[in-house]
């Protein structure tokens, strides 16, 4: 079974906002499957807008049903073709927060190059790094699979598909870098989710 959900430990009342129970054929794209020397890629829909003043990038509510189904089937297709082998959907933590969850569960160091991150026109770097896109994924890809990824995404002009970093051996940590140098964003001494590669 596949079980998932969202809850909030700080809520003044007991609530579960989303829950999922079902079966999948696989292969499963667990974030634990990332390996050292994998490349970190972002796949996200740039055709959208922020919802009101919230950090939510809405690329769904104005999209056609046909396009939504096309996007829905893309990641499973890439998994079945063994083009990507580990992934994590970009969640409320944005690109940077999701990278932390990815590194924590994979037990790897992730180095993100901020200057490689593509974003929609008119969106600031900070807003894009921290927003919750309705369609966005961080993916672990072997360098040898990159040509196949680019070919598979050729028909998706609305999607950002860019190499933004790398996985390395070492403690679970995330570094961000640009032309001015690199800085530590997070390391395992301060657990985020507590779901580590070891457990």
Q: What spans do the regions from the language model cover?
A:
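Glycine-rich anion-binding loops of enzyme active sites
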Residues: 1-52, 166-169, 177-179
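Flexible, glycine/charged-enriched surface loops at secondary-structure junctions
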Residues: 1-6, 83-90, 110-114, 158-167
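A structural signal for short secondary-structure junctions
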Residues: 104, 129-133, 145, 154-157, ...
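Acidic, Ser/Thr/Pro-rich beta/coil linker or hinge segments at domain junctions
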Residues: 155-199
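Short, surface-exposed beta-edge/turn micro-motifs
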Residues: 37-39, 134-137
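Short, compositionally biased
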Residues: 52-68
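Helix N-cap motif at beta-to-alpha junctions
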Residues: 140-147
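Active-site-proximal betaalpha loop/short-helix elements
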Residues: 64-134
